[in-house]
From Swiss-Prot:
PANTHER family per the UniProt record, alphabetical: 60S RIBOSOMAL PROTEIN L3-RELATED (PTHR11363), LARGE RIBOSOMAL SUBUNIT PROTEIN UL3 (PTHR11363:SF5)
Function: One of the primary rRNA binding proteins, it binds directly near the 3'-end of the 23S rRNA, where it nucleates assembly of the 50S subunit.
The keyword Signal is assigned to this record: no
Pfam families linked to this entry: Ribosomal_L3
Compositionally skewed regions (Polar residues) per UniProt: 244-256
Listed PROSITE patterns: RIBOSOMAL_L3
Name by which UniProt lists this protein: Large ribosomal subunit protein uL3
Record gene name: rpl3
Family affiliation: Belongs to the universal ribosomal protein uL3 family.
SUPFAM superfamilies per the UniProt record, alphabetical: Translation proteins
MF GO annotations: RNA binding; rRNA binding; structural constituent of ribosome
Chain positions covered by the region annotation Disordered: 1-35, 234-256, 312-335
Length: 335
């Protein structure tokens, strides 16, 4: 008889499994600097899911050129605004902020979240005074605009940092300066194109405190062990020595409301209007009537949750731009 063996239940790569610090997800890495100069991120609000019928454009696939049904997530993506430019420098302890310049005219809702300077800076003087050799990275402080999404009743904007990529360092600095001087308004279509692959980050649906069976996926007790009064507890907390409980032991605790980033999510369509809204609206969201994006598959988080996108850092296939969508289902999700 072979020696019985199996991997442990649950991944330690996600520990400690605690609540996310903020409902705005963060990106710790960005794509390489190739292509045109532009922002490398955008954000929207998850409305719900539906399905579309599109023509399979994958080469050599058994269904190439045929109509296929694909599940999609509808993300409402109204225009965002850029409020400031922040420059970073390299230090022995990582990248640290070097300086920042705020726009002269910021949105009134931003005062509810941040202490915005009374007067903005002069970007031209900043470019002339700074030595580009000191600059390690250029990022833009962007935020959503409350009221642009009727399904998300928020008064405070969601603020985040978005990297400027592509071109040379001087080109990126000029792009960021021009962006905030022109009002900072930018759309999802200015950053992405239908058919591209992106990484979607969000805060998952919170489930509160759960036991080890649901939290870690351990097996329930069987047979005689199940007749000891409980079935959903682990057998023991570890050996006598070392006389402590190790962090690898599956125990009950917080489940859900974690930040998760899903790689290589294909953008099926970038459009404007109420076409994807089902009969009766999306449950817990309502109607989508404005700029929206259809993402293949699911994205982390419940309805109304903020979802951030960036260009794929590890694409597993070449992008197939502008897929042909022939039908978007608007059947009611309420039965």
């Amino acid at each position: 008889m072979p020696q019985p063996n199996r991997p442990r239940k649950g991944s330690m790569g996600f520990s400690p499994r605690k609540r996310a610090e903020s409902e705005v997800p963060r990106f710790n890495s960005w794509p390489a600097d190739d292509g045109e100069v532009g922002l490398q991120g955008f954000a929207g609000y998850k409305a719900g899911m539906t399905h579309v019928v599109l023509v399979d454009d994958k080469a050599n696939a058994p269904t190439e050129g045929m109509e296929t049904t694909v599940p999609v997530t509808v993300v409402e993506t109204p225009p965002m605004r850029a409020a400031a430019v922040r420059l970073y420098e390299d230090t022995p302890y990582g990248k640290k902020p070097l300086t920042e310049v705020w726009a002269d005219d910021t949105h009134e809702s931003l005062d509810r979240t941040l202490s915005v300077p009374d007067e903005g800076g002069d970007t031209d003087e900043l470019i002339e005074a700074l030595d580009t050799e000191e600059i390690a990275d250029i990022r833009v402080i962007t935020h959503t605009v409350p009221g642009d999404t009727a399904g998300v009743p928020k008064k405070n904007p969601d603020v985040m940092e978005t990297r400027v990529g592509g071109g040379t360092l001087a080109d990126r600095l000029e792009f960021a300066a021009d962006l905030i001087e022109d009002g900072g308004v930018h759309a999802f279509g200015d950053v992405f194109r239908a058919g591209e692959f992106t990484d979607a980050a969000g805060i998952t649906k919170g489930k509160g405190t759960q036991g080890p069976v649901k939290r870690w996926g351990v097996q329930k007790r069987k047979g005689k062990h199940a007749r000891q009064g409980w079935r959903r507890r682990i057998g023991n907390l570890g050996p006598w020595n070392p006389s402590r409980v190790r962090s690898t032991v599956p125990q009950q605790g917080q489940t859900g409301y974690h930040q998760r980033t899903e790689l290589n999510k294909r953008l099926i369509d970038i459009n404007d209007g109420d076409e994807p809204t089902p009969d009766g609206g999306f449950p817990n969201y309502g109607e989508v009537d404005g700029p929206y994006t259809l993402v293949k598959g699911s994205v982390p988080g419940p309805e109304q949750r903020l979802v951030r996108f960036r260009p794929a850092v590890r694409p597993n296939e070449s992008p197939r731009l502008d897929p042909e969508v022939r039908y978007v289902s608007t059947a009611s999700n309420q039965g």
